[in-house]
C-alpha cells in the first residue's frame, strides 16, 4: 500500500515537472500546408485563399477587411477595386458584400458598389447645395452626375432627405423633378411680366425662349398667374392671345359686319384668326349666315335683297343683275355661289331662272327672246328635206346603228348561207337510180316567172356569192359613228337674238343664251323634217304594198299546187319534199315580208337573201305590231304547210294585206304554163344531169296532171313513181341514161370511161328529149 502511494507521488511529480517545463517545436511550411489541408478536408476549418494561393484568411476576417475598405473609401467602395486591393477572388467579395448589406441596414449594395449612410448623407448635402444654386433639378441629372441608379437616388437619397437635408419640394406633375420655392416665385414673376407686356398674339415658344422658363413649368403656373389673355393650346405651336387684342379683333369684325352685312374670310385671317367660320359663329351666335367659299353673307341681306329681287324678276318676266344689288366686294364667282345657294335652299323655284355671268334671266323672258327661232326651225327642216340632206342622214344613221350591231352577224350568217347552199348544191346533184337508190348530180331547174322562189334554194351562182361576201366583208368589226345632223346652229340663233340684247346692253351673252336653246330648236327642226320625210313617200309605199301583196299571193298559189303534186309520192318522200318546198318558196315569202316590214320600220338591210337567224334578228328590231307574227312565221318553216300558211296570213294581216280567194278554174292553165316553161328549158339544156331532171319533172306533170317542186336528189323517186305509166323501152331508156349520168359524175373528167359515157349520153339525149316532149296517155288531153 505504501509503495503504491509512493508511485503515485512520483508520477505526480513527473507530471508537475512536465507541466512546468516549456518546449518549443517549429513546423516546416510543408507541414503547415498539410495540416491546413487536412483540416479543410475534415471541414474543421473555413478559410479564403488569395488569388495567388499563397495566403489564406478566414471569412470573418475578410468581412472585417471589406468594411475597413468601405470606411477608407469614404462610404462608397467598388467591389472590383476591393477585390484587387485584398487580392481575393471577386465572387467571394461579392458574396460577403451581399451578406454585409443584408445584415446591416445602413449599408446598400448598388451596381457592384457598397454605399453606407454616411455617403448618402454626403451626396444629399451636395444635392441640396446644387438645388439651392439652380432652383430646379431632376433625377436624371443626378443619376448622370453621381453614376447611381435613378430609382436609388429618388427613393433612398432625395425623397428620404427631402425637407431635412434637401430644402425643396417635389413637382406634383413630374415626381422626378425637384425645385425650390424661390425658383417657382422667380418663374412666376418672369411669366407674369412677359405676358403683361404682350399686346398681340405671340407664339409661346418665343415667350419661353425670351424668359428662359421651361414649357412644362409655364403651363403649370399659368393658371396660378391668371394672365390677361389666353393660350390657344398646350401644343408646340400654341399662341398666347392677350385679351386686349381679342377685344380689338371682335370690335373690328362687328363693325365691318354692321356696315357691310358680310365678312371676308381673308380679312379675318389677317387678324390672326385661323378658323374664320368658327369665329364668326362664336362672335354672332344669334345671327344666321350663308357661308360661301370666300365670304359669309348675312341672312338678312340675302332675304331682303336677293330673294325679294328674284321674286320680282320672276313676276315681271324680266332679268336681274345680281352685281347691282350685292356688295361690290363680291366677285362673279361669289355671286354665282350666292345664286346657287339660294336655289338650293328652295327660297325660289330654280326652274324659273337661268344664271349667266351674274345676270339672272326669267324663263318667260328667254322664251320670248327666242320665239323667232321657231320659224327658223321650220325653214331649216324644209330646206333639209328639199336638198336631201336629211334623207342622207337617215340612211347613214340607220347603217351605223344597225350595222354596228348586226353587220358582223349578217356577214357571218351570209357565210353560213354559202355553206348551206354548197351542201344543197352537192345534195341536189345526186339522184337515185331504180330500186338501188343510185343518185345523179344535177343542176336545179331555172325558175319560171311565177315560181321565182324556186331557184332561191337551188341557186349555185358562185359569182353572186362572191358579190355578197365582198359587200359584207371588211370593216364589219369597225364601229361606225354618224355625226349628229345640225339643222339649227348656235350662230343662227345668235343672229336672231343679238338685236334685242343690244338694246339691253347684254349682247355679250348672246352666244351663251343661244347655246342653251340650240339643242332644243335643232330637235324641233329634226322632228319637223321627220314629219315631212314620212309624208313624202306615202305614194311609193302604197305601190310597194300592192306589188308585194300580189307576189305573196302568187307564191301561196304555187305552194298549194306543188303540195297537191307531192302528195302523190310515198309518205317518206312527201316529208322531204314538204321540207324542201318550205325552205325554198316558204323562205322567199318570209324574205319578201321581212324586207317589207323592215322598210316600214325604217330599217336598212344590205342582204336581201336572209336566213332564219337574220330574219329573227330583224324581227326583234321591228315594231311590236309585226314582231310576234314574223317570229311565228319563221318557226312555221319547220312545220307543216298548213301551219306555215296560217302564220303567213297573220303576217299579211299585220301588214294590212289580203289573201286572194282560191280560183281552181285557173289551176289547169297554171299547170300547163308551168309545163311549157319546163319544156322550153329542156330544149335549151345541154347538161345531161339537168336534162334528166327536167325530163323527170315534165313526165311527172304529164302523167299525174300535177306540178312538182323537187331538187335533183328526188329524180330517182320521181322515176320510180312514173315507172308504172311508161313502157319497158321507155323505162330502160331513162334508167340507162340515169346510170350513164352517175358514171360520168363518179369518174374522173379526163378518164376514158368518162369520155365513153359522155358520148353515149350525147347519143341518147335526143331520145330522152323526145320522150319528155311527146309523151302522152289516153287520159291526158293534147291541150295538157
UniProtKB/Swiss-Prot annotation:
E3 UFM1-protein ligase that mediates ufmylation of target proteins. GO terms for cellular component: endoplasmic reticulum membrane. GO terms for biological process: protein K69-linked ufmylation; regulation of proteasomal ubiquitin-dependent protein catabolic process; response to endoplasmic reticulum stress. It comes from the Eukaryota. Keywords: Transferase, Ubl conjugation pathway. It is an enzyme of class 2 (transferase). Residues 401-481 are annotated as: Disordered. InterPro entries: Ufl1, Ufl1-like_C, Ufl1_dom, Ufl1_N. Its EC number is 2.3.2.-. This is E3 UFM1-protein ligase 1 homolog. The keyword Transferase applies. Belongs to the UFL1 family. The keyword Transferase applies. GO terms for molecular function: UFM1 ligase activity.
